[in-house]
Design a protein with these regions (language model features):
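Polytopic transmembrane helical bundles with strong interfacial aromatic enrichment
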Residues: 2-164
Length: 164
């Protein structure tokens, strides 16, 4: 299928870039937490949580707001996507991922408070990791759905056609 219309192409590129931003940030933040939190001192844990929240605010929070917005604009522009069953699954997984992402942020705030107060953090750590892993699995699944339905392939084709 050949997409026409400049706005749809901009939406497609923006959607693709935001998805990559969120996925890349999620992988980096999860790796940072899993590789260093248990080994860190109390001050190190506080610093790590502040850094994770800061980077999450600047990347994942923005992506989790604008990705659905741009997706809705794409669907408004090309309503035939509402007839594609894979798209319904993609939207469902994306909305669940956004909800669990926000839940993981709440757990991270509780974890930060527990570290500051000196309370046990093991249960909160497990809950945070569980939420983050589910979000990561849903994000990868959503990207896989896009690849399987030629969304990313057409995005790559569009970008390469503009470059040369």
């Amino acid at each position: 299928m050949v997409e026409s219309g400049m706005m749809y192409n901009l939406y497609l590129i923006g959607h693709f870039i935001l998805a990559l931003l969120w996925l890349g940030a999620a992988i980096y933040l999860d790796f940072t937490f899993l590789s260093g939190f248990n080994k860190a001192t109390t001050e190190g844990k506080k610093t790590m949580i502040v850094r994770i929240r800061s980077l999450s605010d600047r990347t994942e929070m923005i992506a989790s707001f604008f990705l659905p917005l741009v997706g809705v604009l794409m669907i408004i522009d090309r309503t035939f996507w509402l007839k594609v069953g894979v798209m319904h699954g993609k939207i469902l997984l994306a909305l669940i991922a956004i909800g669990l992402y926000h839940a993981s942020r709440g757990v991270l705030k509780k974890l930060e408070a527990a570290v500051v107060e000196g309370n046990p953090t093991e249960g909160l750590q497990k809950r945070y990791v569980m939420f983050r892993m589910i979000v990561l699995i849903f994000l990868v699944s959503t990207v896989a759905m896009i690849v399987s339905y030629k969304g990313v392939i057409s995005t790559f084709f569009l970008i390469s056609s503009w470059l040369g």
